Swiss-Prot record:
The protein's name in its UniProt record: SH3 domain-binding protein 4
One of the GO biological process terms: endocytosis
Superkingdom of origin: Eukaryota
Summary of subunit composition and partner proteins: Homodimer or homooligomer. Interacts with DNM2, EPS15, clathrin, the adapter protein complex 2/AP-2 and TFRC. Interacts with the Rag GTPases RRAGA, RRAGB, RRAGC and RRAGD; the interaction is most probably direct, preferentially occurs with their inactive GDP-bound form and is negatively regulated by amino acids.
Coiled coil: none
Domain SH3: 55-114, 654-724
Residues with PTM Phosphoserine: 131, 246, 251, 279, 296, 637
Main location: membrane
Subcellular location per the Swiss-Prot or TrEMBL entry: Membrane, Clathrin-coated pit; Cytoplasmic vesicle, Clathrin-coated vesicle; Nucleus
Tissue: Expressed in all tissues tested with higher expression in pancreas. Expressed by retinal pigment epithelial cells (at protein level).
S-S pairs: none
Pfam families: DEATH_SH3BP4 (PF24094), SH3_1 (PF00018), SH3_2 (PF07653), SH3BP4_C (PF23637), UPA_SH3BP4 (PF23640), ZU5 (PF00791)
UniProt source species: Homo sapiens (Human)
Amino acid sequence: MAAQRIRAANSNGLPRCKSEGTLIDLSEGFSETSFNDIKVPSPSALLVDNPTPFGNAKEVIAIKDYCPTNFTTLKFSKGDHLYVLDTSGGEWWYAHNTTEMGYIPSSYVQPLNYRNSTLSDSGMIDNLPDSPDEVAKELELLGGWTDDKKVPGRMYSNNPFWNGVQTNPFLNGNVPVMPSLDELNPKSTVDLLLFDAGTSSFTESSSATTNSTGNIFDELPVTNGLHAEPPVRRDNPFFRSKRSYSLSELSVLQAKSDAPTSSSFFTGLKSPAPEQFQSREDFRTAWLNHRKLARSCHDLDLLGQSPGWGQTQAVETNIVCKLDSSGGAVQLPDTSISIHVPEGHVAPGETQQISMKALLDPPLELNSDRSCSISPVLEVKLSNLEVKTSIILEMKVSAEIKNDLFSKSTVGLQCLRSDSKEGPYVSVPLNCSCGDTVQAQLHNLEPCMYVAVVAHGPSILYPSTVWDFINKKVTVGLYGPKHIHPSFKTVVTIFGHDCAPKTLLVSEVTRQAPNPAPVALQLWGKHQFVLSRPQDLKVCMFSNMTNYEVKASEQAKVVRGFQLKLGKVSRLIFPITSQNPNELSDFTLRVQVKDDQEAILTQFCVQTPQPPPKSAIKPSGQRRFLKKNEVGKIILSPFATTTKYPTFQDRPVSSLKFGKLLKTVVRQNKNHYLLEYKKGDGIALLSEERVRLRGQLWTKEWYIGYYQGRVGLVHTKNVLVVGRARPSLCSGPELSTSVLLEQILRPCKFLTYIYASVRTLLMENISSWRSFADALGYVNLPLTFFCRAELDSEPERVASVLEKLKEDCNNTENKERKSFQKELVMALLKMDCQGLVVRLIQDFVLLTTAVEVAQRWRELAEKLAKVSKQQMDAYESPHRDRNGVVDSEAMWKPAYDFLLTWSHQIGDSYRDVIQELHLGLDKMKNPITKRWKHLTGTLILVNSLDVLRAAAFSPADQDDFVI
């Protein structure tokens, strides 16, 4: 790029911070009022006595030659002067020379006139520590070796890097020049949103000056005429080693040591160790809470490695779909990206699971003067590589070639493919390209592929760029909380494509709280416009109501031009406050995008969501655990607050069909859930729906029948269905609702449960403790029977009734030992809470299966979902001890994580989940269902609920009840 383009890109003098968007306060530390007030000096201007401040770029000198390996890097020779614009990339910095810009290796350059350090002229540092962690720590404190020596906070003209704006472009905020400790004001700290996991936190030293955050460009000022070294601390770790490192080695060590500590938001999210707790119960409670926390969070780095985590919410738009030999199409939600699978893609009986995910930031390789990414990078994963056909990718891109012959002959659209996100990418021929829609056929399928579409002009010559030949659209998205509050923050994002995810995870990082939990923001609205060239954009936000205002100092943010050129997602934060918190209502936000000449490029309006309802209804998502201080704050769910509990009626089940038995069956291995019967007898069938499970040798289809006082399964081939007329040979007692209820609840007492989870669900979903107590058999007993203290809220009263049930069931003095699970489910069914019952039953089944399978869970995972060995290791990794082994008693934990993930992929049908789980267990060698038969009983239970409900509650009242 030409020098004048560089000057245009940097003429605003605004610093670029690490959050992929300029979030520095424009009004507090800058005296500039327009984009044209700062003059960019030539390299020679830095050598005069009164140099011009060089706002954004830091001058470095090359210490060795570098020949680029691709077109995104910058070529230079030893002794060349370069100007660094951004150092957030670790080993790679973004810089320019007098003709073009690109990435340079940080180890190949050295800051110019870097005198105030222990760096000698030879480029060597003596007595460095052996530990890379100490190297990184010391690099973060460079410039802080003056002990408690006071330095006047004024400007020094002999340092061209110390400008009058008092802003360090590599510091996250405006910092006064050399303040004393008592001058530090936390209110001046600029809150940032860090979205890239590679950003390091701010480090502050009490014995060092606060003008540096660890970048080697931040030079300490010295008084005029003084060039002596400042006194060095004797406890400096550089003096504790005999090893010598070169400057190049230091850069590599710094990058390596920084990587593991700043690779993720979740580096502190570690599994608890058993030795940290005094009892096994304490460790179990801590582990369950840790797993709940881990599954409710989203680590972008670990999401693909550990499929058992991060299930609650998708961060980037994704979908998983399973297709059979009939083929079909899979579309990425809320996008125009789809994959078409032809019929016969896999053999009959086989399935193909396709996973698609849109990655927001493209790799560096895809964007340059001759290339521009016009789609998100699509990650495609396939489970089955034994295929007979290719697949077709169709997507809508964010650019069209201009409608003139020269543009069409110079630039073309290309589909690129790679096995790695970072490349290298190879071209894939396009089947067709019509306007902004392209189709490409993917051959030689791999387990994981990355596909992107670019506009590419290989013959473009300087000073032209590919942007001159295309109409490139960028997408502006506005994200905010689910409900507005008296004070909240919104985020404006700029994408180089039209794939704006519905949810954006952000972490707000301040110097007081460097590692907060990420927050999920919702997409309020988005807007597309055509951008003629990559340039600095000024984004402004205004409110249409006087009650809400965007702070004057926060109304404008800047996105750098080179970010747009590289296709990086820019995220800008706008805090909004209400003048009168008592009068909250939705309002309209207007977003303006201006160019560097203050001309409005586009603007759009977005309506905000409503304030939260006054009832403060809890989210509908499942909460498995409660903290102690949250018990009194539980609010009933919307369903519970409107429920009228009907009366369970004991009467005959009338909606039965009957059949004639064609064969006599007597079983050697008795099974409570498989019926024995005599040829010629009649049998009542609860429905004609069939369940599938393994018999003595192979998988069969079964009816749920009632024969001589027992509910169980009968093989469909042994029954001739005759209709609703009761046969004369149908012996045994008549089936009533109370008998049916007692029969189908037989397996409940053999299921494992987590009491805290059950308690939370009931507190959220039952609105009347009186109805609950009556259904449990505690008829007409006062509240004082269940608790001594007076309870204020209905959820707490429900919890006290549940606690009483638990005590009675665990009381060994009772002559009749009751089952907690059975009594609870029976009471809920009598209250017509079928939706709550199936939710509890599915949780019980998954947990019980995990405990029963334990060490054989890998075999089950292979039968259910064809999980790879790497995925299995990822499920186990959070539960390994210090020796890297999962204890045999803890093996149920990865099994439970897998089953939860798998059940979410199956869908919302609790019947399908339990049916597929049963079939998967049947396929195992020496299946556990041979000895543990209660999963069969659970399958009967969930398939009989509709018949029970239809018979026990009058049809006239059904419409008044909520399940």
